[in-house]
Design a protein with these regions (language model features):
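Flavin (FAD/FMN)-binding glycine-rich loop and adjacent Rossmann-like elements that form
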Residues: 1-168
């Protein structure tokens, strides 16, 4: 803001402030399995993989604070870290069984801040959303809780639909 200000030819009726702020990260479910930094950096393969992720670990500043003299603002927490392609497990979409047996969560899934920083991108949302749709259909067809979906059958259906589940 200090350097560039607001765009002078947009949002004239709101003093040039946008109607809605862009939310990069919101609340997330805490499932039985929480995907974390180790899943995107060291433990890259998963038996229940439903797709691949490869976007950088990308988090903007998490805190801004004034400098000691009060003349500027310092940013903390920026993270831009390249990742090796990693597998996305089906489990990230699963709520705890005691909380819901008929719900898949393809966006506010179970992940830490660091893991979510790479998973929150649209390509991964499309991959996870596709898998959620296939898994939901499979759960309905077999009259099973989403936690009991046969992951082997799910993966076979995803492959048949040309999903990429592992590195070549």
């Amino acid at each position: 803001m200090k350097t560039w200000g607001l765009c002078s030819d947009e949002f004239a009726d709101t003093n040039h402030w946008p109607y809605q702020l862009y939310v990069r990260e919101a609340r997330r479910m805490i499932g039985e399995y929480v995907m974390s930094q180790k899943d995107i950096q060291t433990e890259l393969t998963k038996a229940d993989a439903i797709g691949m992720g490869s976007y950088n670990s990308d988090s903007h500043n998490v805190q801004r604070r004034p400098t000691p003299d009060g003349t500027a603002v310092e940013n903390e927490g920026d993270m831009q870290v390249p990742v090796t392609p990693y597998q996305i497990p089906y489990r990230v979409m699963l709520p705890k069984r005691a909380e819901a047996a008929n719900l898949l969560v393809p966006v506010c899934f179970s992940a830490t801040h660091v893991a979510y920083s790479t998973l929150r991108m649209e390509p991964q949302y499309m991959i996870i959303g596709h898998a959620a749709g296939v898994a939901a259909k499979l759960a309905i067809e077999t009259r099973r809780a989403v936690q009991d979906v046969d992951v082997g059958v799910l993966r076979a259906r995803l492959r048949a639909q040309r999903a990429v589940l592992e590195r070549p």
